[in-house]
């Protein structure tokens, strides 16, 4: 099969496919005879309409189908013969100069995967993040858990920061009510930042039954465009004040956290174990991000546009599905521009190609034991870990995510062994405040 692969721009290639008319006509005749056997045409018994009539009715579409099928088949035959690593799907175009009457020519335009060459990793710098969990961090976490279980009890006094208040309010701009500016029995916690600072400051010091007018200046960057940069006067009536009460760290508190016998020491150990696992996950994520950045720097790579577009479309669909899951049912019909995902998509495709090369060259495929360890780590935070483990192994397709994580872990360890490693110790607050 003699064809010439023409190099276009970047990773784009072009081949001209030649389809003999004799083959096209023979395949078209076969398809028309198949159609004849199935055809139900008025005036004829099923399958008995003349072939000439079938050809008149369906000949053009049958020939078009045959050409499409032959083009696809011929292209992939060429790709195999020429050892072309095709990325994405080819685009087929007609050739204007059909100078050979014996054949029909079609141009296939496609991209190929780039040659990935890993640079000198010893020249790259990466950060290995560390953090520790001790008694102070356990105390801090227990305090957070206490606050999450805060109870509010009614009090007959003026409102203070930290209190939960229930109010009626009516806002006006230039003497006119505005959308979203009125509510009855609206509850919020003073000092939690749920309302604008001027609004909250106006409520502090009020007692139940009192009313007052409070002037509020909406910031220019306020999310409500109709009121952004404007001044409103709110008439506020305070209906109820409740002060927060935190639970004691005792047996009842421990039982509420799942410690059956209410042993506080056991509870603290469980808290430490869970927090340590989360801290480890987050520092590993930050270290992995540093490693991935180093790999991007170490490899000069042009990525196939087709793969970037596919990944961008996948990210757009993922975002829409997340919106739907949050209750925004109309989000499924959102027309999200793919350009907003292009940078992220290009990075993901690049890393996918780099990691595949690195794993293949350095035999970094995970062992069965490594995959099991990832699954066990997933399962550890559940009430019945064995049930979770069994779920993963009931369907091997569910092991894709644990396998990918095991691969990434091997890659991170490999790069850390080659690159210049700068250790970076973070505080508990820095780790838990990081997005991971």
Swiss-Prot record:
GO terms for cellular component: cytoplasm. It comes from the Bacteria. Keywords: Cell cycle, Cell division, Chaperone, Cytoplasm, Isomerase, Rotamase. The keyword Transit peptide does not apply. PANTHER family: TRIGGER FACTOR CHAPERONE AND PEPTIDYL-PROLYL CIS/TRANS ISOMERASE, TRIGGER FACTOR-LIKE PROTEIN TIG, CHLOROPLASTIC. NCBIfam families: tig. HAMAP family: Trigger_factor_Tig. This is Trigger factor. It comes from Neisseria gonorrhoeae (strain ATCC 700825 / FA 1090).
């Amino acid at each position: 099969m003699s064809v010439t692969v023409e190099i276009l721009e970047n990773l784009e290639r072009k081949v001209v496919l030649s389809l003999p008319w004799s083959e096209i006509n023979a395949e078209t005749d076969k398809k028309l005879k198949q159609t004849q056997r199935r055809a139900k045409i008025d005036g004829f018994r099923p399958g008995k309409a003349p072939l000439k009539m079938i050809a008149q009715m369906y000949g053009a579409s049958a020939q078009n189908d045959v050409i499409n099928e032959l083009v696809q088949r011929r292209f992939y035959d060429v790709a195999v013969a020429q050892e072309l690593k095709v990325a994405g799907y080819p685009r087929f175009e007609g050739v204007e100069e059909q100078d050979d009457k014996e054949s029909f020519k079609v141009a296939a335009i496609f991209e190929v995967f780039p040659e990935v060459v890993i640079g000198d990793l010893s020249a790259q710098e990466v950060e290995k993040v560390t953090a520790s969990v001790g008694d102070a961090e356990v105390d801090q976490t227990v305090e957070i858990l206490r606050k999450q279980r805060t109870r509010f009890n009614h009090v007959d006094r003026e409102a203070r920061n930290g209190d939960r208040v229930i109010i009626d309010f009516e806002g006006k701009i230039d003497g006119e009510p505005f959308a979203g500016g009125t509510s009855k029995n609206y509850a919020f916690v003073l000092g939690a930042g749920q309302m604008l600072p001027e609004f909250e400051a106006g409520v502090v010091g009020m007692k139940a039954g009192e009313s007052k007018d409070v002037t509020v200046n909406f910031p220019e960057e306020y999310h409500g465009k109709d009121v952004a940069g404007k001044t409103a006067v709110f008439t506020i009536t305070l209906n109820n004040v409740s002060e927060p009460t935190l639970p004691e760290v005792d047996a009842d508190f421990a039982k509420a956290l799942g410690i059956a016998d209410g042993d506080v020491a056991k509870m603290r150990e469980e808290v430490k174990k869970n927090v340590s696992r989360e801290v480890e996950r987050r520092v590993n994520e930050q270290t992995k991000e540093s490693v991935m950045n180093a790999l991007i720097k170490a490899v000069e790579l042009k990525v196939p546009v087709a793969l970037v577009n596919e990944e961008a479309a996948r990210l757009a669909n993922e975002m829409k599905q997340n919106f739907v899951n949050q209750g925004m049912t109309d989000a499924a019909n959102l027309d999200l521009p793919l350009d907003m995902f292009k940078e992220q998509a290009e990075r993901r495709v690049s890393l996918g190609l780099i990691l595949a090369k690195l794993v293949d060259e350095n035999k970094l495929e995970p062992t069965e034991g490594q995959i099991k360890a990832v699954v066990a780590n997933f399962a550890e935070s559940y009430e019945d870990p064995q049930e979770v483990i069994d779920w993963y192994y009931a369907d091997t397709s569910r092991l894709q995510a644990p396998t990918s994580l095991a691969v990434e872990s091997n890659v991170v360890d490999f790069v850390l062994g080659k690159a210049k490693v700068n250790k970076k110790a973070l505080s508990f607050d820095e780790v838990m405040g990081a997005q991971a």
